[in-house]
């Protein structure tokens, strides 16, 4: 396969990246590479690198209501939390194509949430485990917090 980038775009790209600073260059395809097209036109996108997420930053929260106890309800709520986290990171400028988190801890948290005492409402949060610049992976942890008026709660551990 051949990736075709207009010369004018390459010239503009060179003008920008020769300036002082750290730059992130993305190549956006105008064709469908997966279909096996022999020639694909693409366009460069360049932007200054900057921090988009700070370590310890709360990225998203949700509440798991007392009556939400089935595996499907818990899974749905956790998926919603992950989606909200990813959306916020994208709005803040992140280019990562997903989130990184410990799958064993995710599964353990899901089991703990399903097995929690009856009538317990819990607040969940997604927190960044490290600083991330525009092109860095987004590493998060999901935490179980005590909701107002509920019994003491725990949190997932990395």
Residue ranges and their predicted role:
Residues 1-158:
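Membrane-proximal structural modules of membrane-associated proteins and complexes
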